Curated annotation (Swiss-Prot):
Protein name per Swiss-Prot or TrEMBL: Glycerol-3-phosphate dehydrogenase [NAD(P)+]
One of the protein's GO biological processes: glycerol-3-phosphate catabolic process
Protein family: Belongs to the NAD-dependent glycerol-3-phosphate dehydrogenase family.
InterPro entries: 6-PGluconate_DH-like_C_sf, 6PGD_dom2, G3P_DH_NAD-dep, G3P_DH_NAD-dep_C, G3P_DH_NAD-dep_N, NAD(P)-bd_dom_sf
Native source species: Blochmanniella floridana
Keyword terms of this UniProt record: Cytoplasm, Lipid biosynthesis, Lipid metabolism, NAD, NADP, Nucleotide-binding, Oxidoreductase, Phospholipid biosynthesis, Phospholipid metabolism
Disulfide topology: none
Binding, NADPH: 14, 34, 108, 141, 258, 282, 284
Enzyme Commission no: 1.1.1.94
PANTHER family: GLYCEROL-3-PHOSPHATE DEHYDROGENASE, GLYCEROL-3-PHOSPHATE DEHYDROGENASE [NAD(+)] 2, CHLOROPLASTIC
């Protein structure tokens, strides 16, 4: 089987996991992170014991502190950093990139303040001629790293690039790749699912049971579809596929999800600030909620679940009042 090379930008839990998964099958992978002390520990331990205990690096996985070396390693640059630092990382990367590079976005969410899709941030910083792809889907990092079966969605309008990345990912054992050209839909799905997961967590934390959970997931999917179609998603297909429904169900129902656990703490009566501290890791859904809500206002999309979660997080609304507002709202949709 043909071997590939890729540079992974972002040495957190997901970046490390996908680097391990790709390198495990003989592909040449270089992992870069911004925290030099963290990178030194990864080099020494040949593992990320903080985020992925017990998962060790294959011989074909290299760890690097120099962004210049990382950028020069491969034309395929996979970015797996939080959405709020995405632009900053691209700006640093731009100073080191050579010709013919290609960007794979593994980050999920929207850019804070602008609400831009991350692909649009790539085009804004690196130019619209850059080949760009997005990967998304129900893939918890630890399961991906240890090689449990999973499926992922690959989106790109660049057919040649999509073909190359499909074959790179195809080399990963137990990973099934599905293709789409709906780049907008995949990115919107990746942001909205985090918001709904907080809502489902709140419901479960309040002890509302399986019926309420199923209702929130279903109506959350409707909100995802409405927003996606308003912004320019090609069809409903991607939302009922892996990047949409698949990732939504995973994030809403499994306690590996930080967004779900955060919501559960809110539902149990914990204040937003204390719940964040209790989780102890970045919760993408908090910033995603603000950006998704602002997009819903901008495009005049009715998203009642998102609206109530926004009010809980940013307007200090009581969770019980938010639930009552949802139950008693008019039957518009």
């Amino acid at each position: 089987m043909e071997k590939f090379s890729v540079t992974v930008i972002g040495a957190g839990v997901y970046g490390t996991a996908i680097a391990v998964a790709i390198a495990k099958h003989g592909n040449m992978v270089l992992l870069w992170g911004h925290n030099s002390q963290h990178i030194k520990i990864l080099k020494i331990d040949r593992s990320n014991q903080v985020d992925l205990p017990g998962v060790f690096f294959p011989d074909s996985l290299y760890v690097e502190e120099s962004l210049s070396v990382a950028a020069d390693f491969s034309q395929n640059i996979l970015i797996a950093v939080p959405s709020h630092v995405f632009r900053c990382v691209l700006l640093k990367l731009r100073l080191n990139l050579k010709n013919n590079f290609r960007i794979i976005i593994a980050s999920k969410g929207l850019e804070p303040k602008t609400g831009w899709l991350l692909q649009d941030v790539v085009y804004d910083v690196l130019g619209k001629e850059v080949p760009c792809a997005v990967i998304s889907g129900p893939t918890f990092a630890h399961e991906l790293a240890i090689g449990l079966p999973a499926a992922i969605e690959l989106a790109s309008a660049d057919i040649k690039f999509r073909y190359d990345i499909e074959h790179l990912l195809y080399s990963v054992k137990n990973l099934r790749v599905y293709k789409t050209t709906d780049v907008i839909g995949v990115q919107i799905a990746g942001a909205v699912k985090n918001v709904i997961a907080i809502g489902v967590g709140i419901s479960d934390g309040m002890g509302f049971g399986a019926n309420a959970r199923a209702a929130l997931i279903t109506r959350g999917l409707s909100e995802m579809i409405r927003l996606g179609k308003s912004i320019g998603a090609i069809s409903v297909d991607v939302f009922v596929g892996l990047a949409g429904l698949g990732d939504l169900v995973l994030t809403c129902t499994d306690d590996q999800s930080r967004n779900r656990r955060f919501g559960m703490l809110l539902g149990q009566g914990m204040h937003v600030d204390y719940a964040q501290k209790s989780i102890g890791q970045l919760i993408e859904g908090i910033s995603n909620t603000k950006e998704v809500y602002m997009l819903s206002v901008k495009y005049k999309v009715i998203m009642p679940i998102t609206e109530q979660i926004y009010k809980i997080l940013y307007e200090n609304k009581n969770v019980h009042e938010a639930v009552y507002s949802l139950i008693r709202r008019s039957y518009i949709l």
